[in-house]
Amino acid sequence: MKTYKTSVLVSMMLGIFSTTAFSATVPAGTKLSDTQVFRQNTHSDPGSLDPQLVQENTAAQIVIDLFEGLIWLDENGQVQPAQAEKWTVSDDGKIYTFSLRDAKWSDGAPVTAKDFVLGWQRAVDPKFGSPNANYLTKAHILNAEEVMQGKMPLNELGIKALNDRQVEVTLTQATPYFLQLLAYPTTFPVPHHKLAQFGDKWATAQNIVSNGAYQLKQWTINEKITAERNPLYWNDKNTLINTSEYLFQESLASAYQRYQAKELDLTWVPVEQIPHIQKHTPDALIVVPRLTTEFYTFNVAKPPFDNEKVRKALYLTLDRPLIAEHIIGLRKPAATLTPPEVDGFSAPNIAELNQPLTDRVKQAKKLLNEAGYNEKNPLQFEIFYNKYATHEKVALALASEWKKQLGADVKLRTMEWKTYLGERNVGNFQLSRMSIDAEYNEPSAFLNSLLSTSPENVGQWKNKKFDQIMKDAQSTLNDKTRADLYQQAEQLIAEQAPLIPIFYSPLIKVINPAVGGFPMHNPQDYVYTKELYIRK
């Protein structure tokens, strides 16, 4: 059995070389501002602050400040101990035993193993309806699939409290990326005493307590959330930012204006402003590689995209370099759903995408003709996306390209984030904008979204061959075999076109140069405010 804890030797085994696992690391000689307030744009109101209900990254950013799981990911994406101060792993890699710190909720109640068990059980409880119900199946938690489907009771899930301070997790197979998965809110604890008192309303502004570095101070709907340091956080003494504000500014242009007016310290960048920033304030621009794919998914349960030939025609005629490199900029054209940089992935050669666009257009027109579409009966459909300047540019480019190349009649429909999510999740669309920000660094973080049983499979493409490929990939212990299977999965996506990969997107933002400690090498886009500080 292997034991992991916070020590120099074991930290080196984990790829962590700092003896201080938790603190805002301030270089010697740095003068700190008297006002340690960090203000970031998180786009829109979170759907919920309940860890098991989080489904958008902007909400997750707030939740990872308010709450803390068993581990966290440092600036290099490496696993660090969090609520668990150490853990052991069985020799077969299937059983993890976590020893918890003497930690407290913000109301003084102790954080117990029961809190983690309840959190994980809620995630797969079919009566609760978590949008990430399949998350624990990705980690191969024992009986997660069966519990999620209502075939087994909650207490059969592979997590149990050995005592108040020990959590035992059982997997169905050794999973190299298991610990990485524990950084996402779905695996965070919930306060069992608050759950007993308020039920699922425990996470409202009036009732919420948290176990992270920050606690909720105020939630002004459609404006901002303000959080302040949690004095009961186990490592509060090493936290420097006193107040963290999350502003809801959907307009990139307006957010950038607020940044220029020094009302924001961190926000996304309007595409048209990037050249100006690169020329005049390059130190303010941050471009961090991350594991993110922007794509459009077809609803294969509705015409016209229940026809594979129609889907394939659009897939072939998209000018990815034009959109990624010129219309949007600083993005990489995507040929596969999984980015090439993902660990354990060797991107297949999608030969047809290497053909000249003119040849692909000819092939696409032939497919449309076979499907019954021509100049007299043009293809008609609707593009659906959430309101956001970049998404608007992409949608307009798609409509323009398909009109130009195929004579398609394309309409646009856009909605605010929450409404868009609701419509998308119930399948009220024909072709919808989507993106995946990997929760862990492995191809299944992307490909699992297309499993027939996945709640993320809103396009309803169901393919038994794909499901079997993914099952085989997850069960093999041979890295080469697994990589080959992932290639096969991507080839099948290219053949049947349930979606159209468009580009891989880095994190592109402007930051107040006075902010220190920002993670520049975490490809999973985790930014913990407790690691930041403000210089004078």
Language-model features, listed with the residues they occupy:
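Alpha-helical secondary-structure segments
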Residues: 113-119, 164-170, 212-213, 240-243, ...
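Extracellular/periplasmic solute-recognition and catalytic clefts
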Residues: 217-228, 245-302, 325
